[in-house]
Regions:
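The feature captures the beta-strand-to-loop junction immediately N-terminal to the Walker
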Residues: 41-43
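Helix-to-loop junction immediately C-terminal to a conserved catalytic motif
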Residues: 56
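Conserved ABC transporter NBD signature motif
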Residues: 63-77
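ABC-family P-loop ATPase nucleotide-binding domains
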Residues: 87-140
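Catalytic Walker B motif of ABC-type/P-loop ATPase nucleotide-binding domains
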Residues: 153-157, 162
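ABC transporter nucleotide-binding domain
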Residues: 168-252
Length: 302
């Protein structure tokens, strides 16, 4: 799949009374190309869940615009998107078999029964949803989402309830979905090591805005870990620095060549990079060209 999956311009969302409410998103602008597996990362309260809800058409922004799969109204493309929120809302009185049947009935012409049955795999079909564990409900919710054959999957902390084996299995399924069908996946998670091996795109949200955005590889390569005696870090942008004894370790955003005579230079892991930015909320933003929003095409705020 080519094109743009999600694009935001000055996106804002405030909950509560105007002027005195909670601002979950504030002048948030970015672009997500289609066909990527995107890690949506940030501290608690950064706006990740709000962004996913808006992209799923579960609300309207109070400022700016949000385009999903080319539509200025995300609600118009719900049949082409799948959303698994944190609370996995399923009907507790239904059985697993009833739930899968409902998925097929609600998605005529798109339903992939074989995929849904494969993901639901070990779940007893006669078991009622209310009797399932958190991890089992997650598996059923993902079976519904993948069975829909969406062009865009929005997953809010999807793996938190899963044991390591199930997590590994379902991450493999998600990767295959992108490789085989070009599905765009946006996945929020606090398990940074898991994201590093699975995601090729990054949106780091803090304070209601995207602070880092682009190809994960490009964002990592734009930074360096410098270790050495306390010295001059200019002209590089310092994201975080720490001193232990007479040795300084700094994560910098490179502005030209690094003086290797003064510093030992290594490339940070994605986890090291994200942890440093989590500890340094005032670090300047970085959006690669692919993540920079283009010209505004319309306004979809309330």
């Amino acid at each position: 799949m080519t094109g743009v999956a999600i694009e935001a311009h000055g996106l804002g969302k405030t909950y509560g009374r105007r002027g005195g409410g909670h601002r979950a998103l504030d002048d948030c602008s970015f672009r997500l190309p289609a066909g990527r597996v995107c890690a949506l990362v940030g501290p608690n309260g950064a706006g990740k869940s709000t962004l996913l809800n808006l992209a799923a058409g579960m609300g309207r922004p109070t400022a700016g615009s949000l385009s999903v799969l080319g539509s200025a109204d995300p609600g118009d493309v719900r049949d082409r998107t799948a959303f698994v929120p944190q609370d996995k809302p399923l009907y507790p009185q239904l059985t697993v078999a009833d739930t899968l049947w409902a998925g097929a009935e609600l998605n005529p012409g798109r339903w992939d029964r074989a995929t849904a049955e494969r993901i639901a795999g070990p779940l007893a079909r006669t078991a009622r949803v209310r009797s399932l564990s958190g991890g089992q409900r997650t598996r059923l919710a993902l079976a519904l989402a993948l069975g829909k054959r969406p062009e865009l999957m929005l997953l809010d902390e999807p793996m938190a309830d899963l044991d390591p084996l199930a997590r590994h299995e379902l991450m493999g399924v998600l990767m295959a979905e992108t490789a085989d069908h070009g599905t765009t996946i946006v996945m929020s998670s606090h398990i940074l090591t898991e994201l590093e091996g699975a995601c090729d795109y990054l949106l780091f949200v803090d304070g209601g805005r995207v602070r880092l955005g682009g190809e994960a590889e490009d964002i990592v390569s734009a930074h360096a870990l410098l270790t050495g005696r306390d010295g001059d870090l200019s002209p590089h942008t310092v994201v975080e620095s720490r001193t232990a004894g007479r040795q300084l370790t700094a994560l910098v955003r490179k502005e030209g060549p690094v003086d290797t005579t003064a510093w030992a230079v290594t490339e940070p892991s994605l986890e090291e990079l994200l942890l440093a930015h989590l500890r340094s909320p005032d670090a300047p933003p970085l959006l690669t060209p692919s993540a920079s929003a283009g010209e505004r095409t319309g306004v979809a705020s309330a």
